[in-house]
């Protein structure tokens, strides 16, 4: 949610700021703005709506400043209007601030500053920050404006409560950009005589792959000569940048109409990368190996003597966690519960001993998930060893906040995902649960070596099977999608390990097509949802081979008896399904335990093509953000 970009260097700042904000559009926003320092003054331009509106306004401005900050805003405090857009300035137009996050005590600060005579012109929490900094500055020595600004920001951040990342300009400091982070992501980029800041590395990769992630409670001063990092008490902190393994092409469409479609087609490569990274190619059951077939690199103490696993996640990551529950229980034999992170904090279950807590978030910055993990850690810290916090993160961003607060992480290696609707990162998260379940199963001897090898063989076949779906079904699914462009409601059904896939299919459709869609366990249809069915409500049923196949077919026939149009996700060789379903989303024949990854692919394609047919913004659906960094 929201996006920050900052620049100081030798190039025209406006161009870099706009380009960076365009790279952050996928995070979701409803207004945008920039501020630069020119001849001792702050120049600020803001606009409601898309960046196109801001760019139109900038066409009438000649601005060659080499220092600036930019922001895309997702409304939290105050409506999405121009006067609420960032940057916000103090009353003297000296200080400009952009901010991500929420200042929880903004009303108290606002009231205090109003009593001092300051005026407020927006409804946002952010506006208190530049006014607070300016208020502190007036009482500091003015002989060195650069040092005074740093000191004022150091004092100001101690008064701010909540999660925030800020970037600050001072009209009196044309060679300095100061940023601060507390519970909201902020990345610094290093170039040749130029430096950048952004809320996500996607804004930086076209300019540099040398980056540094600020941690909570840190301030950074960027000048044309370099970067200095301090803690909130203004003590210097020594930090070293790292090099990203991403290239500029990873944030381009490369010939695809939308990023989402590109990312769907990247899934075979993502699965191959995960398999090559984590599965031991040489492992054979016949060799009676003494080592795990999976290279996760986890501390053995993390999974030793486990009695319970709890998964905390939101949205699509929660669906991946539900698949993980089946795998961890069926393969590793460990009771597993899956919680919405946003609910866990307010109704946490009783503490159980020898419990592994897994936080799943593709960005590593999902506020609800991080807060739930932190709460779980804190309530276990002072307890005896049996209850000590054992926390694992599953994320696509190993440099994220999540990685700093857990014992270990599993990197899903999916690469940058620009489309708001998760596709390849979901598949990568599910794979992470396969690897974890197999690793624990080997350690606990809950599966025979032969059974483990059988699953590994199936996993290695997945990339080619996904390619088969994309190559053989892509055009057919696109044609089918055209028939549902005016549909108002969908029902998705699944059982067992594919019930979460029904939920995921429904979520994908509603996210990007704005069609009301719900996922249900197939056996629950008769307990309420069947009342919704008629000829106008298509039903998508996931009927994969295995223990629940016949039950799903039976449930589908109940829907057909109510005139619903039936769409089946089913193997190419399933003659029974062909006789029941009106339309088929065909997939290769796979083992039931491996079916979620192949079953989800046609549902992604169906959702994409319906949304595209409706002429919608597939990559940036309304009201949604890629990374939800506020609670």
UniProtKB/Swiss-Prot annotation:
InterPro entries associated with the record: GATase_2_dom, GFAT, GFAT_N, GlmS/AgaS_SIS, GlmS/FrlB_SIS, Ntn_hydrolases_N, SIS_dom, SIS_dom_sf
Subcellular location, record wording: Cytoplasm
Molecular function GO terms recorded: carbohydrate derivative binding; glutamine-fructose-6-phosphate transaminase (isomerizing) activity
Domain SIS: 298-446, 480-621
GO cellular component: cytosol
EC number: 2.6.1.16
GO biological process, one term: fructose 6-phosphate metabolic process
Catalytic reaction list: D-fructose 6-phosphate + L-glutamine = D-glucosamine 6-phosphate + L-glutamate
Role summary: Catalyzes the first step in hexosamine metabolism, converting fructose-6P into glucosamine-6P using glutamine as a nitrogen source.
Family matches, as NCBIfam families: glmS, PRK00331.1
Protein name as catalogued: Glutamine--fructose-6-phosphate aminotransferase [isomerizing]
